[in-house]
Amino acid sequence: MERGILTQEYRHEPVMLGEVLESLQLKSGSVVCDCTLGGAGHSVKMAAQVGETGRLLGVDQDDMALEAAGARLDREVPGVPHQLLKGNFGDLDELLCSAEVPGVDGFLFDLGVSSPQLDIPGRGFSYNEDAPLDMRMDPGNNTLNAAEVINTYNEHDLARILRVYGEEKFASQIAREIVRRREQEPIETTGQFVEIIKAGIPAAARRHGGHPAKKSFQAIRIEVNHELDVLERGLDAATRWLNPGGRICVISYHSLEDRIVKNHFKEMSQGCTCPPEIPVCVCGNVPILKVITRKPLVAQPDEVERNPRARSAKIRVAQRL
């Protein structure tokens, strides 16, 4: 990518910005960690809230995002201390140890693929552009990519991934078609994969519910990046590092992510689990978090119209006791 357009490509409208800022309740001097830095759309505003006596930590595994975000923060909030950490938020413990922070007052997780990643065809996230099948959040790592999943996993495992991670009704048919096609030639591009998906879905079903490849692309992306395992580890670490009164704000975009967030907050907010017939608690469980959002926040209609990515966004918030 041309260096001159790097920052421009990583500028996008942050989802539910007002709700995020209101939910985190940051103040001057707070330490805040944006676990999904991206183009720093949320981070710039959070940095402005914590001010020169506060501190912003930004986590991302994408070198392009880190470079663009760093330039934007230097330009728009030059007086606010900020530290950018390259890595996966599943490794939040190690990253925060390296940053030498005693605790954090606010965590933001904006899950899913950023708009700029979708817009760069060579990354292989988009079903609207023909590109190599990659889908790695950190393309610099020599790790599993989408082409390897599609060309080497057996039919049973492919069907399971498409069904569980993509909630794809026609998972078995698509998996069968993948295996049939790869016996003829390797499946190497997003264009090939889209055609295979279409062939595995009945024509009548393809006419409804958005792009027919959306669910399958989501499923393969989650498998490549181990997104659900990473989310669970990230939430566990954030809960441990959160200062009393601090908050975790999570924006999710599909039911699998939202369920993990909901269950984590529920588990961490439970107190005694002893049976009612036991008069004195013996389990020792104490609540760690207080759930702030009994029901998730959703984007207002005007934002959805302006920013379609916000359509499926849900925010859940919890506070450290």
What does each model-identified segment do?
Residues 1-321:
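S-adenosyl-L-methionine-dependent methyltransferase catalytic core, i.e., the SAM/SAH-binding region
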